[in-house]
Amino acid sequence: SALMSFRARNKDRLLKETGIKLGFMGAFSKACALALRDIPSANASIEGEGLGDTIVYRDYVDLGVAVSTERGLVTPVVRNVENMGILEIENAITELGLKARDSKLSLEEMTGATFTISNGGVFGSLFGTPILNLPGSAILGMHAIKEKPWVVNGKVEVDRKSTRLNS
């Protein structure tokens, strides 16, 4: 895809120039933030006592990003993703991930996501069911990018890569 080609062409240069490792999470996070502007029902939080009795629609995107640690999965929150560039998002995810692995996240850094992304693809996952992280109202599960055979002009070719996304 265009994203994979862009990353392959630029990741080494950007790492050298900025110190930021270009992955896929920054681009997917930015794409989600742009889509959430147009789909307010997916960018909401469920609030109230018990199971929640109020849906609050947000005009900002505070994105929860699942991070695996020795103690389990945590979801630190990148605030105001809609106002960030892809490299800024990558940097924020990296910094929060390091804090998570060092058990140094504050409660504020782990609460208030309006939408969450879980990337099981880093573990080779081909499919799965992401678990909604309240108070957010939606989650995106990303999975491994794999080469797949495609029939092109009657011949089987392995020239396309695909991933499964679910919510």
What is each residue range found by the language model?
Residues 1-167:
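C-terminal catalytic/motor cores of large multi-domain enzyme assemblies
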